[in-house]
Design a protein with these regions (language model features):
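Short amphipathic alpha-helical segments with heptad-repeat character
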Residues: 14-17, 21, 131, 135-138, ...
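Beta-strand/loop substructures that line and gate deep hydrophobic ligand-binding cavities in soluble
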Residues: 83-139, 148
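Solvent-exposed residues in well-ordered beta-strands and their adjoining turns
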Residues: 12-16, 59-61, 96-98, 107-111, ...
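Residue-level detector of alpha-helix boundaries and kinks
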Residues: 5, 15, 56, 126, ...
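A generic helix-loop boundary/linker signal
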Residues: 10, 44, 61, 127-131, ...
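Hydrophobic ligand-binding cavity/cleft-lining segments
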Residues: 1-49
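Glycine-rich portal/gate segments that line the openings of hydrophobic small-molecule binding cavities
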Residues: 41-90, 98-103, 139-155
């Protein structure tokens, strides 16, 4: 397979970077805005700090699965980043003050271990599965950001 894909999108939300960080870093709220991740809960650690682990349950029409993720960056009002499965996928949120609120950027990057895992488990079907996940991120990120904006600006 080619170089692992990455996707990012941004939106401006009429809230402070700190408020938005607090919302996003409370992973137990992820199901409020994600079209795929329906629930998250803390496994280890006491919340959004580097090294803490949490699990999530994802649902799409074809299947339901759980993941385990570790926080790798947590700077209030600046960035919140976690890696799924040890080293499979990197999800990140950055918060930049702008006129009218905060620009929130959500990013998603497939890491090399995910490519290896897909090739080992799916063989010739790996590229199709990767394309499926890329499309889910491509459509899911804007939907997540729009829902986050709606929830944040309604609070």
């Amino acid at each position: 397979m080619d170089i692992p894909p990455s996707i990012s999108e941004s939106i401006v939300i009429e809230r402070s970077p700190e408020d938005l960080y607090d919302m996003v870093s409370d992973v137990t709220r992820m199901g409020e805005w994600s079209p795929e991740c329906k629930a998250c809960w803390w496994n280890e650690g006491d919340g959004p700090k580097v090294g803490a682990w949490f699990s999530g349950r994802n649902e799409v029409p074809e299947r339901t699965w759980e993941t385990k993720s570790q926080i790798v960056a947590a700077s209030r009002g600046e960035e919140f980043v976690f890696v799924v499965g040890g080293n499979y996928v990197r999800w990140g949120y950055s918060f930049t003050p702008v006129t009218g609120g905060t620009q929130v950027t959500e990013s998603w990057q497939v890491l090399p271990d995910m490519i290896k895992l897909l090739e080992e488990r799916m063989g010739s079907g790996a590229e199709a599965q990767l394309a499926n996940r890329v499309e889910a991120a491509r459509t899911g990120i804007p939907a997540t950001l729009a829902a986050l904006k709606q929830v944040a600006e309604s609070a």
